[in-house]
Amino acid sequence: MDQLDQLSDYFPPPLPVGQTLFDWGKRTYVMGILNTTPDSFSDGGEFNSLPTAIHQAKTMVQGGAHIIDIGGQSTRPGAETVSLKEELERTIPIIQALRQELDIPISIDTTRAEVARQALQAGADMVNDISGATFEPEILAVAAQHKAPIILMHIRGNPQTMQNLTDYGDLIGEMRQFFSAQVDLARHYGVLPEQIILDPGIGFAKTAEQNITLLRQLPELKRLGFPLLVGPSRKSFIGKILDQPDPKERVWGTGATCCRAIAGGADIVRVHDVEAMAQICKVADALWR
């Protein structure tokens, strides 16, 4: 029996993060994306100065965001890795400034333990690791030390190689195995089960068809007993369905995807277009919760 089978009947208790209590199952929480990068796939270069980043964060809060997710390293397919120094310079000043002005939970989107450590010291509340702690497992020790929730995403390879690693015999079964190993590792490092959130990793080492399959079978991952974060925002599989090459024109396709995710048990949706998605989530919650 693997780690997750042992926890299959575990229902996550409410999670306090800063001044917010996340009461799982009662509503969908909206995570607003704040990329401070010049090369993110849909908003690169728009918010990589302190004034524009702060303005965008406040706009997202006014639009209904419950979490602001700050990232200084693009994770689009083929993205090059920036230096540790550059990633810190892109994120830490913004976290420090936002912490002075907003009470909302702040998430640091990073795969590096040192970035996570400095971000949490600067005022971030949680860690969002798109590698699921496979790049730098010591990031789990940082989260445990700070008693910070951590989001573990499913991926194969890295942003340079992941789209060549989409050959699955059993997509959901292999994702379960991945999460089993990473949850076990997180607990080994001292992360409490109630501080773990899982992300199936839409668009990461998955084809368009596999992303659709994943969304259809999301309840199978919900059965693992952990809160689920789903990040479909403006992704290329939506563009393929809509024949829409411009990521910013995929808003309503993103909305439809969020509805499917919520019906399948998603607890958090990670999105660019916060105001529109917050309204969609409210209606979806009224229908399915």
From Swiss-Prot:
Q: Which PROSITE patterns match?
A: DHPS_1, DHPS_2, PTERIN_BINDING
Q: Which Gene3D superfamilies match?
A: Dihydropteroate synthase-like (3.20.20.20)
Please report the stretch or stretches of sequence annotated as the Pterin-binding domain.
Answer: 28-282
| Keywords tagged on the record | Folate biosynthesis, Magnesium, Metal-binding, Transferase
Does the keyword field hold Magnesium?
Answer: yes
Any one of the GO CC terms: cytosol
Q: SUPFAM superfamilies under this entry?
A: Dihydropteroate synthetase-like (SSF51717)
Enzyme Commission number(s): 2.5.1.15
The residues that hold (7,8-dihydropterin-6-yl)methyl diphosphate are 75, 109, 128, 199, 235, 270-272
- Please provide an example of a Pfam family that matches this protein in its UniProt record: Pterin_bind
State the source organism's domain of life: Bacteria
Q: List the disulfide bonds.
A: none
GO: which molecular function terms? dihydropteroate synthase activity; metal ion binding
GO annotation, biological process: folic acid biosynthetic process; tetrahydrofolate biosynthetic process
Pathway terms, separated by semicolons:
Cofactor biosynthesis; tetrahydrofolate biosynthesis; 7,8-dihydrofolate from 2-amino-4-hydroxy-6-hydroxymethyl-7,8-dihydropteridine diphosphate and 4-aminobenzoate: step 1/2
Under InterPro entries, the record lists: DHP_synth-like, DHP_synth_dom, Dihydropteroate_synth-like_sf, Pterin-binding_dom
Residues spanning the membrane: none
Asked if Magnesium is a keyword of the record, the answer is yes
State the needed cofactors, names only. Mg(2+)
Q: Where Mg(2+) is bound, by residue?
A: 35
Catalyzed reaction equations: (7,8-dihydropterin-6-yl)methyl diphosphate + 4-aminobenzoate = 7,8-dihydropteroate + diphosphate
Q: What does this protein do?
A: Catalyzes the condensation of para-aminobenzoate (pABA) with 6-hydroxymethyl-7,8-dihydropterin diphosphate (DHPt-PP) to form 7,8-dihydropteroate (H2Pte), the immediate precursor of folate derivatives.
Q: Which family does it belong to?
A: Belongs to the DHPS family.
The protein here is known as Dihydropteroate synthase
